[in-house]
Amino acid sequence: MRKTYGITNEKFLEVKKAITENGGTIYSDNRFEIKGVKGRFEKDYETLTIVITDKPWLASWEMIEDKLDEFFIEING
């Protein structure tokens, strides 16, 4: 699954902070893992693409997408 959001560099730092504050891990090659969801960031100027590569089997792709959308609405205020 791939989702793209408009986001500033400052907000991207907030995203990374939120992941680590909620028990997630961010790796040096822009991969991340949080609560069984694995993926990677692709950052380009003011666009952030999140690619989800793995998820818990109980979580639907739609659920993951909805959570991402909710999070980015909140982070962009």
State what each model feature region is.
Residues M1, T8, G23, K67-L68:
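A general marker of short, structured functional hotspots
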Residues M1-K17:
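Terminal, regulation- and interaction-focused segments at domain boundaries
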Residues I7-K11, N30, D54-P56:
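Beta-strand elements of well-folded, non-transmembrane domains
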Residues E14-K17, E21-R40:
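Ser/Thr-rich, low-complexity intrinsically disordered terminal regions
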Residues V37-F41, P56-A59:
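Short, surface-exposed beta-strand/loop "edge" segments at domain boundaries and coil↔beta transitions
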Residues L48-G77:
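C-terminal structural segments of small proteins and small subunits
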